[in-house]
Curated annotation (Swiss-Prot):
It is found in: Cytoplasm. One of its GO terms (molecular function) is ATP binding. This is Hydrogenase transcriptional regulatory protein HupR1. The gene is hupR1. The keyword Phosphoprotein applies.
């Protein structure tokens, strides 16, 4: 018996927009439509809906207002909003109030709408299965990887550029546009960017929209790998070379007819550089300890954190390999250049972490988002992910506040250029001793107040100050509550 199609609710006050969306989705979904929020609520009270796609601008109640109520009453429903407006205020409201899964901007393409709806339906099913399985795993005390976890990984790996979250005006938009151009051309591509900037995710997205998408995708990071181990991982080893006498198939052969992403290519030894060049030129590889060559037909995407062109000029990287790797070259911006994306990324990471750890969380408060957006994130996406997970672990409420943020982030006051200043930068900055001490004092005051939820009595006691003395320092440095005023709280 065939499974029933997932139910999707389309909400828009314009009949022609509803008709266009229904036409794009009706082959894959059981489509329900509503002309406005009230009609949609009535449908939700009667029907089981997995996905909602809602227009932002509607008379009466906006899409954000409607989806906020949906999150409270039907939190498992995956919510997508369509908007023609890209101002950050609207986006922040949608992220925090409605807990949306994805933005779509007008004009949307039917294939884009269908792809987003399919992904949302899969995520709905996956979340429900994961919740059920988490309960079973606790009872069984099992540490083995679950079937649902495998399916979730396959789902994420199976999606293309839609997995790369960003706002419409993101600095990431240009890199993604270039990646889309190169994806369908079977040429090597070099992704330049700092560690944690999303190079592997972009490489995976390129693979899954390429002509090789039905073939395997493998990745390896050469940074820190000894030459012999890197050679074995990439090209394999003949029987008798490794302990135990077993042969090993390298990633280059496993990725035959698929895609291989090699990060940290700047760390490749001269011998490994030569082997990579040979593989690119002739498709030939030689396993460690072997005499005969094997062949592979793969698409190579590489990632580099260093400037390979400069390394070529210094004689530390082969010029012929650099030019072979960089038929297409894409520069990825660091997270500090994507401040407008931080809230969206953090919300998505929080939702994933909440499901993974079985702990409910609805989002961040305004003060927490302000700190997260103003921090420099030298560790890029990895650091943000770890910080969000840490906040979730210590959270006592469904809405995560700024007091949960690590001290070094709370103390990192933005500089005039917008970048955060580390303690070392403050110590070596221009100015007198008094100026530098004042900078450090401002950071300590700001962090202590935030951690104590702006209770000045507790903050003053912790700092060994009177409330009058604390107030004098706040006035002197112009330190205010993130909401725009210093919040008064009664003493304990």
């Amino acid at each position: 018996m065939a499974a029933s199609a997932p139910a999707i609710l389309l909400v828009d006050d314009e009949p022609h927009s509803l008709a266009a969306m229904k036409l794009a989705l009706e082959d894959d979904f059981d489509v329900l439509t509503a002309q406005g929020a009230e009609a949609a609520i009535a449908i939700l009270e009667e029907e089981w809906v997995q996905v909602i796609i809602c227009d932002q601008r509607m008379p009466g109640r906006t899409g954000v207002d409607f989806l906020t109520e949906v999150r409270e009453r039907w939190p498992e429903t995956v919510r997508i909003i369509i908007t023609g407006y890209t101002d950050s205020a609207s986006m922040m409201a949608a992220i925090n109030d409605a807990g949306i899964h994805q933005f779509l901007t007008k004009p949307w393409h039917p294939e884009q709408l269908l792809s987003s709806a399919r992904n949302a339906a899969r995520m709905f099913t996956l979340a429900r299965e994961n919740e059920r399985l988490s309960l079973e795993m606790r009872l069984l005390n099992s540490t083995s990887e679950s079937r649902v976890e495998k399916r979730r990984r396959a789902l994420r790996e199976g999606m293309g550029f839609e997995t790369i979250l960003r706002t419409p005006n993101s600095a990431m938009t240009g890199a993604i546009a270039l990646a889309r151009q190169f994806a369908s051309f079977d040429v090597p591509v070099l992704l330049r960017g700092e560690p944690g900037s999303g190079r592997a995710q972009l490489a995976r997205a390129m693979h899954y929209v390429s002509l090789r998408s039905d073939k395997p995708f493998y990745e390896i990071n050469l940074a820190g790998l000894p030459e012999d181990l890197a050679m074995i991982e990439l090209f394999g080893a003949r029987r008798g070379v490794l302990p135990g006498g077993v042969a090993k198939i390298g990633l280059a052969q496993k990725a035959d007819r698929g895609t291989l992403f090699v990060a940290g290519v700047e760390a490749a030894s001269p011998a490994l550089q030569l082997a990579l060049l040979r593989m690119l030129a002739d498709g030939a590889i030689t396993p460690l300890g072997g005499q005969e060559t094997a062949s592979t037909n793969l698409r190579l995407i590489t990632g580099a954190a260093a400037d390979l062109r400069a390394m070529v000029a210094e004689g530390r990287f082969r010029a012929d390999l650099y030019y072979a790797l960089s038929a297409g070259e894409i520069a990825l911006p660091p997270l500090r250049a994507r401040r407008g994306d931080v809230a969206l990324l953090a919300q998505s990471m929080l939702a994933e972490a909440a499901v993974r750890h079985g702990k409910q969380a609805l989002g961040f408060d305004a003060a927490a988002l302000e700190f997260l957006e103003n921090y420099d994130w030298p560790g890029n996406l990895r650091e943000l992910h770890n910080e969000v997970t840490r906040m979730l672990i210590f959270a006592q409420d469904n809405v995560l506040g700024a007091e949960l943020i690590s001290r070094h982030i709370l103390q990192a006051a933005p500089s005039e250029s917008g970048a955060d200043r580390s303690a070392e930068e403050v110590m070596t900055a221009d100015g007198t001793l008094k100026d530098r001490i004042e900078l450090i004092e401002m950071r300590i005051l700001r962090e202590t107040l935030t951690r104590n939820r702006w209770n000045k009595s507790r903050a003053a006691a912790e700092l060994g100050l009177s409330r009058v003395g604390l107030r004098a320092k706040l006035d002197r440095y112009g330190i205010e509550h993130p909401a725009g005023r210093v919040q008064e709280e009664e003493e304990d």
